[in-house]
Amino acid sequence: MDLDVVNMFVIAGGTLAIPILAFVASFLLWPSALIRIYYWYWRRTLGMQVRYAHHEDYQFCYSFRGRPGHKPSILMLHGFSAHKDMWLSVVKFLPKNLHLVCVDMPGHEGTTRSSLDDLSIVGQVKRIHQFVECLKLNKKPFHLIGTSMGGHVAGVYAAYYPSDVCSLSLVCPAGLQYSTDNPFVQRLKELEESAAIQKIPLIPSTPEEMSEMLQLCSYVRFKVPQQILQGLVDVRIPHNSFYRKLFLEIVNEKSRYSLHENMDKIKVPTQIIWGKQDQVLDVSGADILAKSISNSQVEVLENCGHSVVMERPRKTAKLIVDFLASVHNTDNKKLN
């Protein structure tokens, strides 16, 4: 074979090998960096742009797609210890002609974390209202979506600021009072009584604990490689002390049942979505809400746990689109 041809293959092979080796090295040595790159790439692919808004010296980080139009804008609030990118799996299946805004909740990701911040549910509601006013999102009423802790905040927000919200989607929200505790809540109470706050199941610090948390939150058993579990833990560990502080704040007497205490004040059309096999917050919470919110509808998803957004993103997006179409008399075809 001609020497130039051999050299060409060597150069081509080396050129291809460099990114492959870089990827393998990242996967093995810096899995957390790979996870960040993954979210960055996914945001770009879906057309989500990251921006910052400021209220005095407080910074909010958010991503958005689209512009306000004749359809309601959609504001999405994530759950405890998550971030705005958790919604990307749902955004993928939402129409591109909708104005979507996903914000990092107080203290999370790119939003300001302050030791002076009021992390109670009502405190978070007031912060989100500041964000809404920064963006002038309430220039006309918007659709509000929240899951878990974000659902807790969303429900109380709709009660506190009814003129801001035209409709509401609550995805397995926290903040309700049940007649009996499920095993997860019983375990939390035992930890609380023993003051073992280092062992909160929703705040993993090892790959094994991360795997246990994923099993707790999901009905579907995802097979997650050890390196990815390590990466997920590495991303969270620097923030775990904040997560503990936040967790203790939202489960104390001041905040624990804020949604329950305010649900009868919610007057906008409300959609309640819950995974039937939710091990974190029992699915019976859907009936509790439906009995107090007169203009509500319940969607219970079979074979689905607490992580509805991650387990059933396509179904969640369809339910939201159908709900908006029915509530706002919009042709469903135009939303798709």
From Swiss-Prot:
Cytoplasmic compartment residues: 30-336
GO molecular function: monoacylglycerol lipase activity; phospholipase activity
UniProt KW Mitochondrion keyword: yes
Highest taxon in the source lineage: Eukaryota
Description of pH dependence: Optimum pH is 7.5-8.0.
Active site: S148 (nucleophile), D278 (charge relay system), H306 (charge relay system)
Enzyme Commission number, as recorded: 3.1.1.23
This protein's GO CC annotations: AMPA glutamate receptor complex; GABA-ergic synapse; glutamatergic synapse; late endosome membrane; lysosomal membrane; membrane; mitochondrial membrane; mitochondrion
UniProt-recorded name of the protein: Monoacylglycerol lipase ABHD6
SUPFAM superfamilies: alpha/beta-Hydrolases
Any Pfam family: Abhydrolase_1
Any single GO BP term: phospholipid catabolic process
Cited function: Lipase that preferentially hydrolysis medium-chain saturated monoacylglycerols including 2-arachidonoylglycerol. Through 2-arachidonoylglycerol degradation may regulate endocannabinoid signaling pathways. Also has a lysophosphatidyl lipase activity with a preference for lysophosphatidylglycerol among other lysophospholipids. Also able to degrade bis(monoacylglycero)phosphate (BMP) and constitutes the major enzyme for BMP catabolism.
Keywords: Endosome, Hydrolase, Lipid metabolism, Lysosome, Membrane, Mitochondrion, Signal-anchor, Transmembrane, Transmembrane helix
Description of what induces expression: Up-regulated in small intestine and liver by high-fat diet.
Reactions catalysed, as given in the entry: Hydrolyzes glycerol monoesters of long-chain fatty acids; 2-(5Z,8Z,11Z,14Z-eicosatetraenoyl)-glycerol + H2O = glycerol + (5Z,8Z,11Z,14Z)-eicosatetraenoate + H(+); 1-octanoylglycerol + H2O = octanoate + glycerol + H(+); 1-decanoylglycerol + H2O = decanoate + glycerol + H(+)
Membrane topology annotation: Single-pass type II membrane protein
